[in-house]
Amino acid sequence: MRVVLQPAYVLHSRPYRETSALVEVFTPEYGRVGLVAKGVKRQRTHRFSLLQPFCPLLLSWTGRGDLVTLTGAEAAGPIPVLTGEGLICAFYLNELLLRLLPRRDPLEALFSVYAHSLPSLIHAQQRQQILRLFERDLLAYLGYGLILKYEAGTSRPIEAGQWYSYQLEKGPVRLLSEDLEGMKVRGHTLQALARGALADPASLGEAKRLLRWLLAFHLGDKPLKSRGLLEELRRLGNVSRKEERP
């Protein structure tokens, strides 16, 4: 199979043999794809300089199976200037995609969400909301979408002033007892998450705890490296301790 000029972003790359690299990319029509980039490390070729995370690309490849051979790479736009926490947040998005996306599953809408999220991470005041909405959309496109408008198993709308216990694989259940399993969350937060408008710190905090809890169920026990990286940068004094990790 030959693919020509497919929009793509590099999620991760690692050396392969002496002069090549194995590159994981995210594309709209083919989802996550594994590429062999032959000879790209030889004298730091132009193609090697292009195959960097967060750079919008147009890639061409040939082959079948889990690994295909890269035949062409072109820049499709500028790389967003990400530093500090913004850069780590972008790596966090990449890590989620690497860990959760299956190979060769087309996800055009999620690709669009990712492409629009990256430049928004430049702005510190938007980062936490951008991350929460990306997590929400990622779960939805993978088939694990949150129930945010109605109580689980009913047609009763979520009430802003009510507390709920969000339960795995079920959804929000009206909180009548502190003994219920699940994640405690306000109806106001569920409504804000449904609208994509997490304006107040309390809703952002609750949404972060809820989504992290839900993602942990699918990620398993292996910790995310991006979270540890932010802690290390904080230890070295490169990131303010007031800045929240992903």
UniProtKB/Swiss-Prot annotation:
Entry keyword Membrane: no
Alphabetical GO biological process terms: DNA recombination; double-strand break repair
Superkingdom: Bacteria
GO cellular component: bacterial nucleoid
Keywords assigned: DNA damage, DNA recombination, DNA repair
HAMAP family in alphabetical order: RecO
Family membership noted in the UniProt record: Belongs to the RecO family.
Function: Involved in DNA repair and RecF pathway recombination.
Protein name in UniProt: DNA repair protein RecO
Gene: recO
